[in-house]
Amino acid sequence: MNMVWTEISCEVPAAMVDLLADFLVELSGNGVSIENLSLDTFSLDTIEDSPLKTVKAYFAVDNALEAHLDAVGAFLSANGPDFAGFVFKNPAVNAIDAEDWANNWKKYFKPVRIGSRLVIKPTWEEYSASPGDLILKLDPGMAFGTGGHPTTKMCLEALEHIFLAEGAFKGVAPVAPVTVLDVGTGSGVLSIGAAKLGAERITAIDIDADAVVVAGENVALNECSDVVELSTTPLQELTGNFDLVLANILAEELVRLAAELAVKVAPAGFLVLSGILSEKENFVLDGFSPYGLKLIEIRREGEWSCISLYLEPR
């Protein structure tokens, strides 16, 4: 007999999604799903965008369930008024079995084109490729790839433009990157994208051992294992430098790691920073200003920014 879980659904303004999702992940110990929202690795183009988003979390039916429900209600009451358009509603509660919980979220993920050549395709979806398409097959797992912001998309767009010498990157570097460092690899999608675009040696690190396992499965699925090396090695312990460094993490972490990230960029190399709220652009730029990197481009989508920097040849 399948185990029964409780699904708790909260409808909140879009700007509150990240805060609520982080709280629910910590409270439940499981991933969350977000409806009516553009996801970071797949498209919801069949769902009309809405200023209100539904965040769902999943809890085991046990003695702690009532306390968890109270905690969610208290969190909404305490934090919701800080966000425009918030109206308190009691979370909707539904019972679902384990099989439904494990698979229900997949219906929101569809293939999506990013840039001119990259296409991210969930493993369970069919897709008819066009000539020149580079297909990234991904199974992010319940806790990966279901975030609510376009930081990964912008990173991939910048990645493609660097490798193809397009847009702001045209004529900046004479050759495409050969070596890549992916800091906070998560599902591994950025490393896979770099491999598909032609990188020859990619080092992908994450402090979360579970993320490294999932990334390894996705790398193998895309037949990139001979190019991508995954580990939980701390950034500070890595040696050498790279033609391209990618870091899709929070602004505060980017600034904290600024010196370590900057020193990993080879001359004539790029540093792409994402996971940045637009209001923190200057905070991040100031954090990296001592290290001699030139601003090439800032991409913006919604409330998020992606910054690309370049280290002039010595």
Swiss-Prot record:
It catalyses: L-lysyl-[protein] + 3 S-adenosyl-L-methionine = N(6),N(6),N(6)-trimethyl-L-lysyl-[protein] + 3 S-adenosyl-L-homocysteine + 3 H(+). Its main location: cytoplasm. It comes from the Bacteria. The keyword Methyltransferase applies. InterPro entries: Ribosomal_L11_MeTrfase_PrmA, Ribosomal_PrmA_MeTrfase, SAM-dependent_MTases_sf. It is found in: Cytoplasm. S-adenosyl-L-methionine binds at residues 152, 184, 206, 248. SUPFAM superfamilies: S-adenosyl-L-methionine-dependent methyltransferases. One of its GO terms (biological process) is methylation. Its EC number is 2.1.1.-. One of its GO terms (cellular component) is cytoplasm. Keywords: Cytoplasm, Methyltransferase, S-adenosyl-L-methionine, Transferase. GO terms for molecular function: protein-lysine N-methyltransferase activity. Belongs to the methyltransferase superfamily. PrmA family. Methylates ribosomal protein L11. This is Ribosomal protein L11 methyltransferase. It comes from Geotalea daltonii (strain DSM 22248 / JCM 15807 / FRC-32) (Geobacter daltonii). The lineage of its organism: Bacteria, Pseudomonadati, Thermodesulfobacteriota, Desulfuromonadia, Geobacterales.
